[in-house]
């Protein structure tokens, strides 16, 4: 989840994803096997959606691609308070740069340079992705 800009991570490290057993003959999907370009093609639209819905304060839309473990871990009251009171979380710029991808286990971490429309400077965005029930889901997201 996007932190309120004080270097504090609201949604922590990803918990191991519950894995649905693949159908007989189907291989298990593992996002780390994708190329950087394939990962960015998935991650960047998800990051842009997080930025958009954070700016609009639409928590339901913001959380729609969260893994079940991340969705359970986030208190909607705290998230609502963050959206209402964080100048950074409500004023994120569309201007981003991807900085790199880290692969670990069954997750990838995509790093972005994020800017604000109201605050000078740059922030580090972190988006953790993996598969859950055959779909790419967000297992962690933060800005610091």
PLM region spans:
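Arginine residue identity/basic-tract feature
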Residues: 8, 19, 28, 48, ...
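Short, charge-rich amphipathic segments
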Residues: 13-20, 57-63, 90-94, 116-122
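Exposed beta-sheet edge and beta->alpha loop/turn motif
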Residues: 100-144
């Amino acid at each position: 989840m996007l932190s309120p800009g004080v270097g504090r991570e609201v949604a922590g490290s990803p918990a191991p994803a519950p894995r649905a057993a693949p159908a007989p003959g189907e291989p298990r999907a593992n996002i780390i096997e994708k190329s950087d370009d394939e990962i960015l093609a998935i991650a960047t639209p998800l990051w842009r959606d997080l930025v958009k819905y954070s700016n609009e304060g639409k928590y339901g839309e913001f959380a729609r691609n969260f893994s079940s473990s991340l969705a359970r871990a986030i208190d909607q009251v705290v998230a609502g308070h963050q959206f209402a009171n964080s100048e950074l979380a409500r004023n994120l710029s569309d201007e981003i740069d991807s900085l790199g991808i880290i692969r670990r286990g069954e997750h990838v971490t995509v790093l972005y340079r994020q800017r604000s429309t109201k605050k000078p400077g740059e922030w580090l965005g972190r988006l953790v992705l993996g598969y859950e029930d055959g779909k790419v889901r967000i297992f962690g997201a933060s800005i610091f």
